[in-house]
A protein has these predicted regions:
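A surface-exposed beta-strand-loop module
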Residues: 78-146, 208-211, 524-528
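Solvent-exposed beta-hairpin/edge-strand motifs
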Residues: 70-95, 187, 191, 505-513
Length: 548
């Protein structure tokens, strides 16, 4: 996902609240009706009707039984979408009622025939309706019904936060990705192309000359990342040889009149992939390829089919978010959404309360890309510039099990946190080994923030626990207070959690590392100290305050 800048009409996908409903728990937790079964594969078929803004479809969910609970199966499908029929292993359910729903008609509880632990089964659900329309995608989610510049239908979906159940029935929780991937079949008119995640498996011609485009995803994938794009697309093909020597197919599906622009702008892809593979390890989805798809919205990290809508220009819609000058030297949407292939798609948080793992590390990929192309000084200036976007309005980590995101500061406060960890490690090779090992150790897995925090602490040999608490779980920015008395500099932390232990680099005429605490400590600056200079390295996101 990307946060919202310079756009008066946009809002964050989820809003923090103090009280939660039963529906928040049904959406955000692993309920008993979810816990007894594990998703193995999704087979999604959808036929959209542009004229009526409606869809009909079928979803087949292959699942494994984890426990013989005797409980119903919770399936999520958001109102006003409606279930028509349900089959288990090819047998239609004839019970009346076959299911019940909650008061919002977003959550269905389906009676099952009863299954043995360890067995694998299929549920097929036929459904139809007019899905929620996205009024301001991607921040306001739903189905997108637009027309291109030549007045031709152009359709897609953006549903992170809102949930994939806005348009197809599923277990709508990040913790349960289909272990064996998914298939997405999309019907489109004869003069339109339907693009999906993964690789094109087949194209089926119908009597009315429409086509069903069948896309196969071999890797685990987040529900919200499975997305169709339907438009007047042409394909640009290329390939990339990664650091392991493997060949990665590159495919760019763009509106026909933008082909030449895309060919030029997407020359940035290979240098970007070189940089990200160097810092994060091999691209995580070689089997499914790398795609950019022109979208009727700004952009999203749809796995192996990244939504691109930045107008073939550098920066964020032509703006440098950092105001450093470096943010206009590369395409923000291309870089940010591609960075999510490692953090967000390869490594996925089980609860959206921990989404900083997606957004903080991915936002730091922007700094790393700047470093790869223009050097460390440029990267530091970009990183420091994006602090302008930090609000410190609420904690980055939110409430668990109620489908609640934390502050939008998860992006650039999160990025600054990662950068400070790098400074404290003070060894770029070691830091790189950690970012690469994260993607290797948690390859295609769902995680919690605490697991990521523990991993970094163990691999670095540095106890960052209080630093994580400070920047992720409070809104307070550490303040380094200091007093100068001739050649003596007294210093301490205030506005911090107990036992806060951020080690920082300062300049008193010479570079010095300090390990402040909440108690006053003394630095002897030396006989040649002029009693004036005391600066904190700008790579640390803290406040400095002199006491007199």
């Amino acid at each position: 996902m990307l946060t919202c800048f310079f756009h008066a009409g946009c809002s964050q996908p989820m809003h923090q609240q103090n009280t939660f409903s039963k529906q928040d728990t049904l959406r955000g937790s692993i309920t008993p009706e979810r816990s007894w079964w594990d998703v193995v594969h999704y087979d999604i078929s959808v036929d959209p009707d542009f004229a009526t803004k409606s869809i009909t479809g079928e979803t087949v969910i292959t699942f494994k039984v984890l426990e013989e609970s005797g409980l119903p199966m919770q399936i999520d499908l958001q109102y006003p979408m409606k279930i028509d029929s349900i089959w288990f292993d090819g047998e239609m359910i004839n019970k009346n009622p076959a299911y019940t729903s909650d008061i919002t008609k977003n959550f269905y509880f389906i009676q099952t025939p009863g299954f043995e632990k360890g067995s694998t089964h299929k549920i097929k659900i036929a459904y139809h309706g007019i899905p929620k329309e996205a009024n301001n995608p991607p921040w306001d989610g739903g189905w997108i019904w637009e027309k291109d510049m030549q007045n031709r239908p152009w359709m897609s979906v953006a549903c992170q936060g809102l949930g994939a159940s806005v348009w197809y029935p599923c277990k709508d929780h990040q913790s349960d990705e289909p272990n064996m991937g998914a298939t997405l079949s999309v019907r489109a008119d004869k003069d339109q192309v339907a693009v999906g995640n993964g690789r094109l498996k087949e194209k089926v011609l119908h009597a009315d000359q429409s086509n069903t485009w069948v896309w196969e995803i071999k890797n685990p994938i987040n529900n919200y990342n499975i997305v169709p794009y339907i438009g007047s697309y042409v394909q640009i093909e290329d390939d990339y040889t990664g650091e392991s020597g493997k060949n990665l197919s590159l495919n760019y599906w763009v509106l026909d009149y933008n082909k030449s622009k895309a060919e030029k702008q997407f020359e940035q892809v290979k240098p970007m992939l070189n940089c990200f593979e160097n810092w994060f390890g091999p691209y995580p989805f070689y089997d499914d390829g790398f795609k950019l798809v022109e979208a009727p919205h700004l952009g999203m990290e749809h796995q192996s089919a990244i939504a691109y809508g930045n107008g073939y220009m550098n920066g964020y819609r032509g703006r440098d978010l950092s105001e450093s000058g470096w943010g206009k030297k590369w395409d923000f949407i291309l870089v940010h959404e591609s960075g999510h292939e490692w953090f967000g798609n390869n490594i996925t948080t089980r609860d959206i309360a921990d989404m900083w793992v997606h957004e903080g590390f991915t936002s730091y990929s922007e700094t790393l890309l700047t470093e790869c192309l223009f050097g460390k000084k440029a990267a530091n200036e970009y990183l420091q510039g994006i602090r302008l976007l930090i609000n410190n309005d609420k904690p980055i980590i939110a409430e668990y099990n109620v489908h609640q995101e934390g502050s939008g500061d998860m992006y650039y406060k999160g990025s600054n946190l990662v950068h400070m960890i790098r400074q404290m490690i003070n060894d770029d090779d070691k830091f790189k080994s950690i970012t690469r090992d994260l993607n290797k150790t948690f390859y295609h897995q769902t995680v919690s923030s605490s697991e990521i925090e523990k991993f970094i602490i163990e691999k670095s040999g540095i106890d960052f626990s209080k630093i994580f608490d400070q920047y992720l779980r409070t809104t307070d920015i550490p303040v380094l207070e200091y007093k100068i008395d001739k050649q003596k500099i007294r210093y301490r932390w205030v506005n911090t959690v107990k036992d806060f232990n951020l080690k920082i680099k300062v300049d008193t005429g010479k570079e010095t590392w300090l390990s402040p605490s909440s108690s006053w400590q003394v630095l002897d600056a030396g006989a040649d100290y002029d009693g004036q200079k005391f600066k904190v390295d700008q790579n640390f996101y803290i406040q400095l305050r002199q006491k007199h």
